[in-house]
Amino acid sequence: VAVFSMEMSASQLALRLISSNGRVNATRLRTGQLEDEDWSRVTSAIRMLKETKIFIDDTPSLSPDVLRSKARRLKREHDLGLIVIDYLQLMAVPGNSENRATEISEISRSLKGLAKELNVPVIALSQLNRSLETRADKRPVMADLRESGAIEQDADVIMFIYRDDYYNK
């Protein structure tokens, strides 16, 4: 698994993975205030992550070409099985400043091509427009994908996370 995280550093992401897999409170893990029963879960989570082939790249403003180059190398050297990108709008297209929607379209098409070329699924996270905050029904729809209709065109599957309890407290 290759994770290209332009939002979080590799160490922040590793802490989150340990916290999640070990079912340990993230704040206690981050501050080192672990309780006795946390230690075995942290150790198990670290062991499991160590045995998992997971590569975290936290290069900021990654371009599609650089990402493609890194993914090809990982596929060749480690038989890459999944690519995760956090998140699409933080990628950059060098020299293209026409408009952001055009850039996002180019990035989206590039990721679709990469998935086909390497025969590897690509999960690309995306931000949503703030417009859904003003609607009565806060459930996200495809039109809420930020800066491009190309995302819905290029994606094989689009999934949204929605927590009713968050909006209806």
Stretches with model-predicted labels:
Residues 65, 101-102:
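Glycine-rich anion/phosphate-binding loops
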